Amino acid sequence: MDIRRATEGDFDAMWPIFQAVIASGTTYSFDPGTSRADAHAYWFGPGLSSYVIEEGGRVVGMYKLRANQRDLGAHVANASFMVDPAHQGSGAGRAMGLHCLEEARRAGFLAMQFNFVVSTNEAAVRLWKALGFKVVGVLPRAFRHRQLGYVDAYVMHRFLEDVQAPG
């Protein structure tokens, strides 16, 4: 599998993955009827870098990296990931996670925070814990899961390097 920076030309391959992931109503807070234009803005908006993972020349997943907050909080990164449901379990998510951590370090971020990991998304929670993330907060009944009703969401965090207190 190869990971590279996404281009506008990749969006035609990214759109069906986005649609398939949000259609389940189990992992992302997007309305299943989210428009193509809104999805495009999510992946190619200002202040973010998007990447795709390809297998055999076909896009099978994507992630985006950005600052979690502006100005005095901009040293903490945030990222979002989607894998084509037909390729879940293939290692694409792990490969993108590792790539993203390295890209975040390279960009000068000191930590990474995921603001909203659905607690029942066991594969994602397991992956992020394996990559060094810790649950640092629980948002009670913050996600309206299509099958399970209201479930918790996690805030997950990890440092990207040892952080020294200033001066």
Regions found by a protein language model. Name each.
Residues 8, 30-86, 97-98, 103, ...:
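Acetyl-CoA-dependent GNAT
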Residues 16-33:
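Helix-loop element at the rim of GNAT/NAT acetyltransferase active sites that forms part
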Residues 104-117:
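Conserved GNAT acetyl-CoA-binding A-motif
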Residues 89-104, 126-130:
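Conserved acetyl-CoA-binding loop-helix of GNAT-fold acetyltransferases
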Residues 88, 114-124, 143:
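Conserved beta-strand-loop-alpha-helix junction that forms the acyl-donor binding cleft
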Residues 2-14:
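A short beta-loop-alpha structural element at the N-terminal edge
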Residues 129-139:
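Conserved acetyl-CoA-binding loop of GNAT-fold acetyltransferases
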